Regions:
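Catalytic cores of nucleotide-sugar-dependent glycosyltransferases that transfer UDP/GDP/TDP-activated
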Residues: 1-475
Length: 475
């Protein structure tokens, strides 16, 4: 089984979000499971010199996209049992950033077409093209388009993964031929048409041989108009080929027993180092040195769907539990200003770190007793799994991947790893925070059992890779 994983970003080469973590971890896990895996992504100028020095130039071609005739170079390197291919074009990928350009549609149409045109230049012809989000949504469509005149690619199957359905790749109707170089029939027959515009994600969902999302609960929720962003009828139509596969995390990189960012190390069997991490963070962030005060943390983008309006409503109630609170992240100004204001109201008890620093995030995970993630929507989420790995008990809303990865430890549950609430309501969130801090104060041994149970959960990519391999083999 040969799989070419098509992505617009991949860690450690370039990253803006969770897609990069998935693209950097899943293909090596597939390789370990026996799949011949390769990855192809754009050669952005942000990819560092340390990686460029390892690359080999393979060849160049020209890609025809509508009336455009563009240079396309191909580079590669080997890493973790995977060949990583890089598509070079300075016009499109020398921008200083990955996304947010006026011509993103053209840039990623070029990349998607280049993937198809470069297939003969790879070490092998793939059995499966695995595409991700709107940036690569044209790949299954271009493949179908060229298959009528290119018999060698007719046996290739496609998988399309929806990481976040909010971003669909919507463009004007005239972009079909002018921008994407496709026959108008792709729009006229409804494949790419939605509400009078082109919708790339819709087209890929219809044309791919299988569609996956990043958790079973999120896959089920996409039938609901509240979550599907207008695509619920498409989800209903393709339900027979849709799968939910929970993401994993890099359990080697995220390991409190060896993480170089931590002032002390610890394991589920020997938790002494976690107290050192907590004390160290309290000192660094100006919090009172109180080892027995529960420390609640958030490491998040400060945007609305992360549930920050609930936190705003409940903040004083949270602090009334007698806890300490740390938030790390950047985003919407209203939330940044809110947390700065609250930090001033609660000196020594609330720290607002309005920035993002990887090492600091790891220190926060290691120091925290509880990790708050009250998302309005969360396709999968990685933070709750990282938190459990570092012994921070998650408090999450039961939605998307949060519902699939956190087991309730409310009364009567013997295998719980965290606290869940269902209604999107500040009172419901505050109630479970009270339960969690109450257990911490009233039954430390019981709390530590929950903490250690979460640390031993298997969040490796092995299970995810096995699920994807099963999907590939049954296309």
């Amino acid at each position: 089984m040969r799989v070419l994983y098509v992505t617009s970003e991949a860690y450690p080469f370039c990253k803006t979000g969770g897609l990069a973590d998935v693209a950097g971890s899943l293909p090596p896990a597939l390789a370990r499971s026996g799949v011949e895996a390769a990855v192809i992504l754009p050669l952005y100028d942000r990819i560092g010199e340390q990686w460029r020095r390892q690359m080999t130039f393979r060849r160049y071609i020209y890609v025809d996209l509508g009336w455009r005739h563009e240079y396309c170079g191909l580079f590669s390197l080997e890493r973790q049992g995977v060949t990583w291919y890089f598509v070079d074009n300075e016009k499109y990928f020398r921008r200083g950033r990955l996304y947010g350009e006026f011509d993103d549609g053209e840039r990623f149409a070029f990349f998607s077409h280049a993937v198809i045109d470069l297939l003969p230049s790879l070490d092998w012809m793939p059995d499966v093209l695995h595409c991700n989000d709107w940036q690569t949504a044209l790949v299954p469509i271009y493949l179908k388009d060229v298959a009528t005149r290119w018999p060698e690619v007719r046996g290739i199957r496609t998988v399309f993964t929806i990481h976040n359905i909010e971003y669909q790749g919507r463009y004007g109707a005239d972009s079909v031929d002018q921008l994407f170089g496709l026959d108008r029939g792709w729009y006229d027959d409804g494949t790419l048409r939605m509400d009078g515009d082109v919708n790339l994600m819709k087209g890929s969902m219809l044309m791919a041989d299988a569609v996956t999302t990043v958790s079973p609960t999120y896959a089920a929720q996409l039938h609901d108009p509240r979550y599907a962003e207008g695509l619920e009828s498409v989800v209903d139509a393709i339900g027979w080929k849709m799968h939910g596969v929970v993401n994993g995390i890099d359990t080697v990189g995220y390991d409190p027993a060896s993480d170089p960012a931590l002032p002390a190390h610890y394991t589920p069997e020997d938790m002494g180092g976690k107290a050192v991490c907590k004390s160290s963070l309290q000192g660094a962030l100006g919090l009172h040195q109180e080892p027995d005060t529960p420390l609640i943390a958030m490491v998040t983008r400060l945007v609305g769907h992360k549930g920050l309006d609930l936190v705003q409503q409940a903040m004083d109630g949270i602090m009334a539990t007698g806890c300490q609170f740390v938030v790390l992240g950047t985003g919407d100004g209203q939330y940044e200003d809110f947390f700065r204001w609250k930090a001033g109201q609660y000196p020594g008890r609330l720290s607002a770190q309005i920035l993002y620093a990887e090492d600091l995030s790891r220190r926060i995970y290691a120091a925290a007793d509880l990790f708050l993630m009250p998302s309005r929507s969360e396709p999968c989420g990685l933070s709750q799994m990282i938190a459990m790995r570092y012994g921070a008990v998650p408090i999450v809303r039961s939605t998307g991947g949060l519902a699939d990865t956190v087991k309730s430890c409310q009364v009567g549950q013997s295998d719980g790893t965290g606290y869940l609430f269902g209604d999107y309501d500040a009172g419901a969130m505050l109630s479970v925070i009270g339960q969690a801090t109450g257990l911490y104060r009233g039954d430390r041994a019981g709390f530590d059992t929950v903490r250690q149970r979460g640390m031993t959960e298997d969040f490796s990519w092995t299970r995810s890779a096995d699920s994807y391999r099963h999907i590939y083999e049954n296309l």
